[in-house]
């Protein structure tokens, strides 16, 4: 018993934070959830924006980190005027070989306390890349000279060619994502027993071998679009921070669902899948946590508001063949698949009407239809099951 307790005490948990520019706010939401879950972080590693967040995690102050992210906007990160247009940004890249990051350096000097990072007791590492010799630099605190932490974080986050390379002692560095955008390997090398990897699907090289080798890893990755990496916007920052929080709680089984967050045990496994699809297709708020009554009320409200489209519903309910479904999918702006949210809802309603009318004989119950439009079929089945249409 004593040996088991000692083993548990010595267990090391690593938080690995991927690169992805403005998407990094998602990682702060994950960290908030981990703190609420009481999961102690012993090691932290990051690339690019993940390196910035890793330094903040090492300092241990979530409120301070939130303050940093409130200040991160496109013009406070890059050397751009507040009223700059996208064409101005392109001009910066062409003329100056990337946008300057002077404002970001100033913010990091303000928020990153190197002394606290070094005294945190956490194993800490970041990744940078030097194009001159194609050098991949996996840097621990011992590798970073005193007083140079912010500089090496800047080096890790210099996403060339969008951003200018960052020079330290005559050596030019560019974004660590060129070496490893999600440095799980560093955590493994340093003896992590459990790895929590936060994947922003950012630009860079994913070392698949390390991802496959990691035996005890919680891989947290959003199914949502987290936004364009080089546009920092306060509203999107708050949105994806909440998504990170919810996705972490889902990863640890506190919440359920993929697109929508449900309180645990609200639906059985099969119904949960259908409800998740229904919530996504009907476009309900995915930043809330739903109990069954609240979810049903919201779904009902959406359907009621959409009933003005009855004529289109009647037409969709009349789809008689897979050929007609494909023609609908290929029509106009939908030729690459269903991307128009309103059209997606309409097809869902039409499918529900057809399933309600024809049961197992419905074209939407066929094996091919469930492969072609699985999300819509599941959503439609949910509406029929709960007699919502």
Enumerate the predicted regions with their spans.
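Patatin-like phospholipase
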Residues: 1-47, 55-389
